[in-house]
Amino acid sequence: MGAKDLAEKNLLQYKDVFSDIVNVNLFGGRCYVSAKELSREPGELITKAVSDDKLRQLQMDVPMKCKKDNINFFLCLENQSDKNNIMPVRDMGYQHAKYMEQIKEAKESNRKTGNYPTPMTKELNDSQKLSPVITLVLNYSQKEWEKPRCLNDMLEFPEDIGEELTKWIPEHPICIINLASQSETTICQYQSDFKYIVRYLCCRNDRKKLDEYFQITEFELDHPEAFLDWLSAVTNDRRYRKAKELIEETEGKG
């Protein structure tokens, strides 16, 4: 994993940053998810392929569980520095693995309590529901992620029956967040350190705007080391690394 990927993951693992991204992009800036309602989930899932019965490891960037009023839902933030042409299928893999994990836990609970469904072919009781799994793909690139945005964008259909087949295939759209093109209204909704990253991305290709951004912005950072790690990795500018080392040295003396 590259330095940029690690820096992106490192910042997003902070719950205040994670919840901020979710609130802005899922709930229109409404503070629905709080940091205290989040708990970190494993970034690796072990799955067994039906085709050959072999175990496989599935990697997710930053997954967390949100618990509200005894109801859970799962959120995963996927970082992409450029378009990935298989992302709809990758996301299907994430979702399948997470839902199957819940099914396995529910069936194990039924086994322990003897509360089996009738008939057994149901596998779960009618009252047993799964927690939603939502993936947000964060596009850090300056280019808009246009396609693929759903499974159908990846498929090639026979011309004579394409329309008929399309109706029977779930589209499985993915949630792409093009950070560099977010509106001023959206950017103003960010409350965490992530707002500085989005503003940086919005003016990265305009040297004049970028210089002005650094000159007039008063950075009030909750996670300065993580932010500077990200900036250093993205710009390949050692000065940000030096600034981080100075912060760490100052904190050590304090």
Where are these regions (language model features)?
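Elongated, amphipathic alpha-helical interaction scaffolds
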Residues: 1-254
